[in-house]
From Swiss-Prot:
Signal peptide: none annotated. Transcriptional regulator that controls a genetic switch in male development. It is necessary and sufficient for initiating male sex determination by directing the development of supporting cell precursors (pre-Sertoli cells) as Sertoli rather than granulosa cells. Involved in different aspects of gene regulation including promoter activation or repression. Binds to the DNA consensus sequence 5'-[AT]AACAA[AT]-3'. SRY HMG box recognizes DNA by partial intercalation in the minor groove and promotes DNA bending. Also involved in pre-mRNA splicing. This is Sex-determining region Y protein. InterPro entries: HMG_box_dom (IPR009071), HMG_box_dom_sf (IPR036910), SRY (IPR017253), SRY-related_HMG-box_TF-like (IPR050140). One of its GO terms (cellular component) is cytoplasm. PANTHER family: SEX-DETERMINING REGION Y PROTEIN, SOX TRANSCRIPTION FACTOR.
Amino acid sequence: MFRIVNGEDYSPAVQQRNILDFGKAPSLLWTDNGSSNDRCDTGGNGRESGQDRVKRPMNAFIVWSRDQRRKVALENPQMQNSEISKRLGYDWKMLTEAEKQPFFEEAQRLRAMHRDKYPGYKYHPRRKPKRPQESLPADSSVLCSRTHIEETLYPFTYKDGCAKATRSRMESQLSHSQPTNISSSLLPQEHRSSWTILRHNRVTQATQTCGRPLLL
């Protein structure tokens, strides 16, 4: 007669994790009269204790791995449960369909017994509670790092803005520092001086380019 372990629920998604506890949990005998200590289903909302939950029937892999786990643990006392589980999973894949067939039949029988005993049973997986997200403090270091990131992403915008601001400040200072009673007679002289310098620069540039002076 096969035995089941009164442990965690066995779903395909978590069976690799659940088989780690088979060597530790107490086992119970399956009987045809349904006298095993199964509990009624509470809906799985997490408010009731684990003793009020109905355990899922074992699948073929769990049926096969119970005795195999004990055997591997006895042969390798130093092997950890995670290593044993990996080995059992590999050994199960290496079995042929004919070798797996008896365990599939036993798992089907256990499901039928479970369905007859709990006709309204519905599996409710346990959900992990969500952790609240921690809010970051908006201190000066965070603001500085955010400004640095934005400056890295948009360097030209920041540089152009700084240049425009600097130029506007310089023009403002120059406008306030210059006297208001500038004589209008100085303007033609400044214009002639600027024109002379510009003409000299153009002649020098033409001489360097063509090897002869450019007549204007």
